[in-house]
Amino acid sequence: MSFVLILPLIFFLFSCGVRKSIHYLPDINQYSLDIPKINIINDSTFSYAQNYLTKNKQQLWELYIQGNPLQLGYNNGALTQNLMRRQEEIFFSKVESFVPSKFKQKILGKFLKWYNRKMYLNVRDEYQVELYGLSQYSSEKYDFIAPRYLRNLYLHGAHDIGHALQDLAIVGCTSLAVWDANSEDGDLLIGRNFDFYVNDEFAKNKLVEFVEPNEGIPYISVSWPGMIGVVSGMNKEGVTVTINAGKSKIPLAAKTPVSLVTREILQYATNIDEAIAIAKKSKVFVSESILIGSAHDRNAVIIEISPNNFGLYHAKNSSKIFSTNHFQSEAYKNDKINQKHILESHSEYRYKKLGELLEEYKELSPEKMAAILRDQSGLNHRRIGYGNEKAINQLQAHHSIIFSPEKKLVWVSSSPYQLGEYVCYDLNIIFSEKRLQNGEFATSSMNIAQDPFIDSQEFKDYKECKEKMREVEKATSTKDQFLSDQYLNHFKALNADFWKVYFETGKYYYSKKEYQKSKIEFEKALTKEITTTQDKNTIKKHLNKTLKKVKLKK
């Protein structure tokens, strides 16, 4: 990296409030604290006073914590220390694979400190105190990125930064709410897939958190160890939040992570109006849709929030509302970024698919909602390949979740993706003295069975295809690594309806100067349901390059 590029970063580091931000620590003196002494019951069950961590038979980790902000952080960190450190290792090893140079890692660390310089000014004091407590149990291994407290703060903006800076396709969530005529018993029912994908290891240790703060409303949240923000959750009052990434400009500074806005909503809102008021006062740095459900209102709305705009989308004369990854409110009607995103991404396709599935299943029960969230077909039941991001089930969800706010019931998917058993939790029981009377947090009699697809040959083929995809990509970029036609034909047959197997095979043949074979593969890819306009244009560019090579050979 040239000195010309380094110089601005050095300037940033010692300007714009960076020095102040990197030395900042929250004031913890107002809070009492008992340092947790963990009781190890077995290799997957731990306790401290009335705080617990255990792994259920579906392999979901369940955490119950209570206390003031500082105590919550310490209790969380002490109980989940090994899981949290493992999660941090998985996340930052991904960063290290992108930036292997130690020198460039230092530059990245400086950039992050500059980029996140205003974050601490936009996060509630109590959450900073909680993060401070949690960070006492973080590893020192990644101090080159930032000190432990700041690093934990930065990680809470990872979802936001990921889709803002890289516009990652790995953030493409789907959620819906139905009530009255569209639900089986007329009650509000909400479902969502959280398609935030780092890698399979990152999704391995799912954490179902039950949090009982000294101030505010107890709530359930589903995410990963080390996370105090909320991406999917419901409070004891029956207010639900789920977040879906929108299309964003690249912001100049990180402010309030959306997951901490939704945490505040769960902790302090009892209805939709209170949730809207919290969202309105928040200074976010990316665009996000927040689907809010409310037992008190027996309704759901979508808050569409961005750095310079705020919109509300209500279902007019309807008892259903859908949210994918584009905005629908009047406030964004003329937003060019949003319009372009609707045309070029897979968001509108999934939106239409939700409408198609609701017509098919009609009055939804939790079981029917699970079937919708697991659906892998395209519009009109077209086979579009397993793992296609145009599907509701993209086979990459970190988790899937179903809420029944009026009954205070929550169903959380177990691995893999949303295919495993949905485990039922009754908040009426969990946030009462009855919570562990039967020896578990779950109300297992109400679980939703795993998807039969788990045991199918198609799923085995899909997993093999993913492994072989990596081999094909590696061979494409390695000059002296060759694959046989037999190998490549088998690779394509494993997921024959998916455009990407033909595209990757075409790139492989092109790299080995087999242009006629490459041409055939790119043409085949273009006959399939391609995920985005950008993907289609990329294939066309590769095909045009190949056609020129074919002509030259003649």
Functional labels for PLM-detected ranges:
Residues V301-F322:
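Extended amphipathic alpha-helical segments with heptad-repeat/coiled-coil character used for oligomerization
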Residues C16-A164, L266-S289, A295-A300, I321-K554:
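C-terminus-biased signal that marks the final domain/tail of proteins
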Residues V222-W224, N235-E237, V286-S289, N308-A315, ...:
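A general structural signal for short secondary-structure boundary/capping elements
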Residues M1-I22:
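Bacterial Sec-dependent N-terminal signal peptides
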